[in-house]
Amino acid sequence: MAVENAINFREICSLLDISESYKCTINAFLDNVEKCTDKHYNDALNLLDTFFSNEVKSNSLVNDLIFCIINSNFDFLKVFKSNKLRLENLQIVYESAFNENKPFLKEFSAKDKINKEVKKNLYSTPAVTRFAPEPSGCLHIGHLKALLVNYNLAEKSNGTLLLRFDDTNPVKNYEKYEKEILRDLDTLGITGLKISHSSDYFELLVDEAVSLINKNLAYVDNTDQETMRIERFEGIESKMRNINNSESLKIFKELLQGRAPGYCLRAKIDMSNPNKSMRDPVIYRASDKMHGRCKLYKAFPTYDFVCPIVDSIEGVTVVCRANEYKDRNEQYKWFLENLELENKPEFNDFSKLNLEDTVLSKRKIDKLISDSLVTGWDDPRLATIQGIKRLGMHMTALKDYINLQGASNKTNVISWDKIWAMNKKVIDPLSPRFMAVEKINCVRVFITNFEGLKYTKNIPLNKKNTSLGSKDVLFSDTLLFSQEDGFVLKENEEFTLMNWGNAIVEKKVVENSIVTELYIKLHLEGDYKSTTNKISWVSESGAVTATGIEYGKLLVNEEFNINSKIDKQYYVESSITNLSTDMKHVQFERIGFFYCDSPCVFHLVPFTKQKRTY
């Protein structure tokens, strides 16, 4: 469940005519649900089960609310169903609410079937869809579902995806981020799109606004923002609502020239409509800034006014957008009808992508950048397309995971571990293997029976995928082990040197609890199956120094995590310098998978760090 959904449930709870004990229990229940882990889900369920076991009088309002909370979150519902036999009291409440709500569930199910049929029909003719980001920042994972739903529909129906930059806010400098968004799309493999800007249609949008004024369907208003907010909430008509059209038109023209401060233009729809988006929305607002691409005006259209008009003009046939905009669909249709626009797109709503512990707010990201807490929009700790790419996300895995979620209206919170698990499956066969040793307190290892000069041996870069090519491994009489491996080996122990064979520890030198040297002799005829410890190593001669960076959570308890970036130095086998530039993922054996961000700088891919067992 997304946190915003939980907050809505809190608001509902606060409005219900129920006792304070009910309200306190439900809020405590939601505290656990918001944390989105199986442990907290179980805690939440046990809390309610205990509450209902204390001979609490049944309340149908509470039962319905709890039923809605449990059913609104697929992951939570799964946990509940797996535990329902021991949640005896809660099960009684749930089943009671389930039986009472059966008619509504059937109706919802029927609507869902209709929606599936509508979506099936979408593919029968070429669809024209659009992706309309505001170029005020780079694309992040939150944009990705909207992008892919629109892209996939266009692809599957042999249609067209339009890219429209929503540049209606003159205060913002859009040019920089337009280039960044095109770069993001290229990274995702989405290219060759027809590009337009909302500002391309500013003159036409002015004409449409004038048309609404002349039809007595729009009026200028100088009500202050706070009063307007209250009036819209309470359904109170503005004092300016019935201004005559000629006066409204005169002031609107002054507004466009920056000579009517404090005014805006509102659509005259229906202030008593239960859908608040229909309560005379603002469609033009003043600005003291000139637009970068259009120097004619000092008042600019709102997103809700632009979309239906430009969608219709550009030939969009299906508007695919998150269901958080669903209330605005009625408003969208009102503009199409009252402006007599011929092309009327259909709607395909889907649930917003919700991710746990993820900063997606542009305002928050800008603040982190300005405070120098992150390096920019492509910082690997940010969930931007470039950020997660630098963290080791393969775009195939990312797109596949998002596509698996489909265009459903069901709200789920996505756990990063699931995305990274899919990513590992993609990068594993594509990743060359290299041995690496952490530099700090590394152990020098001397082979007492090494014969002759150092030599190289050619082996596959990835034994599971020999098509990646091969590498030369350097064998010499002096090796480097990690302190961790040096510490665990005992004198006279036989162990296995990876990619070489068995060896026996002859002597172990320890100073101040730190292993400094090992003396070993090769025993290559030994059986590697009989050894407990398989040790990765690097020849001291020719070892390359590389930086490995491990990134953690950006925020902890809403505060910046000062430990969100940890640098380590490694000695890596010399053949890594011959790595092809198109091989961006590697595995440091027994350490984890890494993304090559720049020469000899590697970022640890999340959830691939290997736990050592001895």
Swiss-Prot record:
**Catalyzed reactions per annotation:** tRNA(Glu) + L-glutamate + ATP = L-glutamyl-tRNA(Glu) + AMP + diphosphate
Q: Does the keyword Protein biosynthesis apply?
A: yes
Name the GO cellular-component terms: cytosol; methionyl glutamyl tRNA synthetase complex
What does the UniProt keyword field contain?
A: Aminoacyl-tRNA synthetase, ATP-binding, Cytoplasm, Ligase, Nucleotide-binding, Protein biosynthesis
The protein's name in its UniProt record: Probable glutamate--tRNA ligase, cytoplasmic
Cell compartment(s), UniProt = Cytoplasm
Q: Name one GO molecular function term.
A: ATP binding
Carries keyword Ribonucleoprotein?
no
- Enzyme Commission numbers on file: 6.1.1.17
User: What broad class describes the main subcellular location of this protein?
Assistant: cytoplasm
Q: Cite the HAMAP family for this sequence.
A: Glu_tRNA_synth_type2
Q: Motif 'KMSKS' region: list the residue ranges.
A: 359-363
Q: Which InterPro entries match?
A: aa-tRNA-synth_I_CS (IPR001412), Gln/Glu-tRNA_Ligase (IPR050132), Glu-tRNA-synth_arc/euk (IPR004526), Glu/Gln-tRNA-synth (IPR000924), Glu/Gln-tRNA-synth_Ib_cat-dom (IPR020058), Glu/Gln-tRNA-synth_Ib_codon-bd (IPR020059), Glu_tRNA_lig_a-bdl (IPR020061), Ribosomal_bL25/Gln-tRNA_synth (IPR011035)
Q: Which family does it belong to?
A: Belongs to the class-I aminoacyl-tRNA synthetase family. Glutamate--tRNA ligase type 2 subfamily.
Motif 'HIGH' region: where? 135-144
Q: Which residues bind L-glutamate?
A: 130-132, 166, 303-307, 321
Please name the GO terms of the biological process aspect recorded for this protein, alphabetically: glutamyl-tRNA aminoacylation
Q: Which PROSITE patterns match?
A: AA_TRNA_LIGASE_I
The protein's matches in PANTHER family, at most eight in alphabetical order, are given as:
GLUTAMATE--TRNA LIGASE, GLUTAMINE-TRNA LIGASE
Q: Record's Pfam families?
A: tRNA-synt_1c (PF00749), tRNA-synt_1c_C (PF03950), tRNA-synt_1c_C2 (PF20974)
Q: Give binding positions for ATP.
A: 140, 324, 359-363
